[in-house]
Amino acid sequence: MKDLVPAWIDGALRPVGKLEAHQRGLRHKAVSVFVMRGPETLIQRRALDKYHTPGLWANTCCTHPLWDESPADCAVRRLREELGITGLYPAHRDRIEYRADVGNGLIEHEVVDLFIAEAPANLKVAPNPEEVAEVKWVDLYELNAQVKRRPERYTPWLRIYLAEHSERIFGTVATS
């Protein structure tokens, strides 16, 4: 059931096409991963041909589990597919819900399983150009300051995570 994500319709979880979920603003499952290196987090700039939020900076990895996939398996799979990261098994941190307009008539209404992992010193990152335009490591406090200065450069969900859920994700408040 590739490209079918778990979404709630009339109170029941059903497989729905990812684009349809965004067009209809359906509440659906998602996964977000933050890979850390001490006080820094790895962020990605989304590929320019993504159908929503192209070219914007996001957390390490943000995606939707397949219909029959666990959030933990999804996190590992998408780290590999988007960033070429293998051998890293992020820990489940929390679950949050948000709703955001992502442009072009599309809505993200996600119930997100949040994962976090500490990068080993020898972590190799090889971004898939179909998914990721570039990556960089950035200090969490500096990232928060950058998001406040230029919010239009960042995805709505990253802005929400930092502003409203920092302590739940990182165990600290990401303030500048």
Curated annotation (Swiss-Prot):
Keyword Iron: no
Record's protein name: Isopentenyl-diphosphate Delta-isomerase
Family: Belongs to the IPP isomerase type 1 family.
Pathway assigned to this chain's UniProt record: Isoprenoid biosynthesis; dimethylallyl diphosphate biosynthesis; dimethylallyl diphosphate from isopentenyl diphosphate: step 1/1; Porphyrin-containing compound metabolism; chlorophyll biosynthesis
Cellular component GO terms, alphabetical: cytoplasm
Substrates-to-products reaction catalysed: isopentenyl diphosphate = dimethylallyl diphosphate
Organismal lineage: Bacteria, Pseudomonadati, Pseudomonadota, Alphaproteobacteria, Rhodobacterales
Bilayer-spanning residue ranges: none
Gene Ontology molecular-function annotations: isopentenyl-diphosphate delta-isomerase activity; metal ion binding
Cofactor: binding details: Binds 1 Mg(2+) ion per subunit. The magnesium ion binds only when substrate is bound. Binds 1 Mn(2+) ion per subunit.
A GO BP annotation: photosynthesis
Binding site for Mn(2+): 22, 28, 64, 108, 110
Boundaries of every Nudix hydrolase domain copy: 26-160
